[in-house]
Amino acid sequence: MIELGVNIDHVATLRQQRHTAYPDPVQAALRAEDAGADLITLHLREDRRHIQDADVYAIRPLLRTRMNLECAVTPEMLEIACAVKPSDVCLVPEKRTELTTEGGLDVAGAQAAVTDAVQLLAEAGIRVSLFIDPDARQIEAAARAGAPVIELHTGAYAEARDDAAVQAELARVRAAVAEGLRHGLRVNAGHGLHYGNVQAVAALDGIAELNIGHAIVAQSIFDGWDKAVRDMKALMVQARLAAVRGHA
């Protein structure tokens, strides 16, 4: 069944706004697991704008599920990842001026560096994912780099405003899923997904995992953290089951 990775970055964003000790991302991670999260995702950025090094080290030994650590392809971040040894590392692009990750990693344009990073992490026993746009060229480059997993950037789908654009972007994601599977890759997806748009993506056969954070944190203000996580997971599972029944 499709899995939910709960991204806790914006729990840390709220904390860092006042440099307080609360809300605690560790507590958010453990509560998310209790509410049905299949893994916990967190992004240690170079600018440390939300998740801090201490969060990563504190959360890692406490999780009962998987830790998916997002980080840039830099010596510092790769060193931290190898020290922490999460089950998964997702390599992502970073710009200091961006509000959130603006696009996928250009694997094709940095083939050697990404390949070296994938090999380094794999030798440390870490499964590597590459966060890329739903583009055949990038998928092929990810396969050449030796990454066993890709995460498709769903931002363009999430930002599409009219039905024609939504359907076009969804078709693009669907084609990318098929291309990833053709290369023997595990295919995940995420970015910009929320309670109103997640089901169309969750219904796509071949997507193993969705990573979602901002929408869950936002909804938790009104519904509470546990319910926000449970409701997102329920939407995903319902969509996948309906799709399976439709194909039967």
Curated annotation (Swiss-Prot):
Pfam families: PdxJ. The keyword Cytoplasm applies. Its main location: cytoplasm. Its EC number is 2.6.99.2. InterPro entries: Aldolase_TIM (IPR013785), PyrdxlP_synth_PdxJ (IPR004569), Pyridoxine-5'_phos_synth (IPR036130). Keywords: Cytoplasm, Pyridoxine biosynthesis, Transferase. The record marks E151 as: Transition state stabilizer. It comes from the Bacteria. Pathway: Cofactor biosynthesis; pyridoxine 5'-phosphate biosynthesis; pyridoxine 5'-phosphate from D-erythrose 4-phosphate: step 5/5. Coiled coil: none annotated. One of its GO terms (cellular component) is cytosol. 3-amino-2-oxopropyl phosphate binds at N7, R18, G192, G213, H214. HAMAP family: PdxJ. Homooctamer; tetramer of dimers. This is Pyridoxine 5'-phosphate synthase. It comes from Bordetella pertussis (strain Tohama I / ATCC BAA-589 / NCTC 13251). The lineage of its organism: Bacteria, Pseudomonadati, Pseudomonadota, Betaproteobacteria, Burkholderiales. The gene is pdxJ.
